[in-house]
Regions:
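DNA-binding alpha-helical recognition surfaces that contact promoter or target DNA
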Residues: 15, 19, 33, 49, ...
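A short, Lys/Arg-rich alpha-helix, primarily the initiator
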Residues: 1-24
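Short alpha-helical DNA-recognition segment
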Residues: 25-49
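Short, charged recognition helix plus adjacent turn
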Residues: 2-7, 67, 74-85
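Short, basic-rich loop-to-helix N-cap that marks the start of a DNA-contacting helix
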Residues: 45, 52-64, 83
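Residue-level detection of the helix-turn-helix DNA-binding "recognition helix"
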Residues: 22, 36-37, 52, 81
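Alpha-helical residues within the helix-turn-helix
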Residues: 22, 33, 67
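Residues that mark the N-terminal boundary/hinge immediately upstream of a DNA-recognition element
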Residues: 16, 27, 58-61, 72
Length: 85
């Protein structure tokens, strides 16, 4: 069985967050601000680390990110399947 996280990747959704954030022409600061309006405090630097796979993401943060990006939660994990193969 393949290892899911090799010690350098701290989450499975970072690349997807970056993809959809950029598609929506949203800056990391804007994403951070929209999350804050929902009561979820993720600073711009943390958004950067999430996208770089160097920060873990809580379930609450993942849910809020999906809401802000207007995508289903499952969509956040679109690239995760390859990690299991």
């Amino acid at each position: 069985m393949a290892r899911i996280i090799d010690g350098t990747e701290m989450n499975l959704i970072g690349a997807t967050v970056r993809k959809y954030r950029k598609q929506r022409k949203m800056s990391q600061q804007a994403l951070s601000g929209k999350l804050e309006l929902m009561g979820v405090y993720v600073c711009r630097g943390s958004v950067s680390r999430i996208e770089d796979l160097s920060r873990t993401v809580t379930d609450i943060e993942a849910y809020a990110i999906a809401q802000v990006l207007q995508i289903p939660m499952e969509e956040l994990f679109e690239g995760a399947k390859e990690k299991f193969e």
